Amino acid sequence: MYKRQQAWSGDVVSDWGVLRNQISAALNLSLTGIPYWNSDIGGFFSANKFPEGVKDPAFHELYVRWMQFATFTGMMRSHGTNTPREIFMFGERGYWAFDAQEKMINLRYRLLPYIYSTSWKITSEGESLMRALFSDFPEDKEVLDLGDEYLFGKSILVAPVTSETRSRSLYLPAGTRWIDFWTGEVQDGGCEITRETPVDIIPLYVKAGSIIPVGPTVQFATEKSWDDLQLRIYPGANGEFTLYEDEDDNYNYEKGKYSTIRMTWNDKERKLTIHPRQGNYNGMLQERKFHIVLVNGQDGLGLDNESYTVNVEYQGKKINIKLP
């Protein structure tokens, strides 16, 4: 059950307090050994608090914030009654609620290499996708009571906005440095900060030493191959990541039909090592490009930053890349 269970929080109502409670509910379920969790974006029942539904800008804001949170759960899923939920029912491109939703949908798709590889760690090693902070920072007592922040995988700290506000305070765990996903600003851990949160921004902080693979912008998961992934290196510590791939839509991985590519970052030497590919499966890419980005205040920021530090060809053999 642990490897495949997908739970949801039930037919909850559209309410800011309910949105806040979704975070701790997800983390509690993850701690019981069920790694995949989701909720109805915007709440299932909206008529009580928002009788006008998608005609009400107040519902738009709650829905957008809920979608931002859902982007970093086991399944990103919109579902409900009383009012339509399709993105085009909120307006057109150029309207803030439409644009903020499109931004999160694109981000979810672009993070699929990271999410899919993390899911393999769940299957093969029993890891979790939504991680309570004390699981990874047991020596930091400040995280013991934090129920509104979490790690998504081992690298991305998520601090959802759960009220009608344009800023929120959050705590960055001690023992590492953190890099703002959107701006590249570096913060020392072990402190509370205040982050501005315009309606299209959810606070995201990446742990120093992380390697995050970023895929193409797509309309569905398998629309484009992963033959030119961006690899974002967040400096400040050593780190590693294993990219997992398989045939996408069957159980052949249970028969060993998959591949892994281990990547390691040596921060002192500023060296990325992409190790030999392990495994094989039908349709596996024999060669590909990696666009490697050393994240700083300009490069590797947010969703659409396509700049890169160096471009390499990879054919399954070990390569070392020295970065400035």
What residue spans do the PLM features occupy?
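Accessory, solvent-exposed terminal regions and/or long lumenal/extracellular loops of proteins
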Residues: 201-320, 324
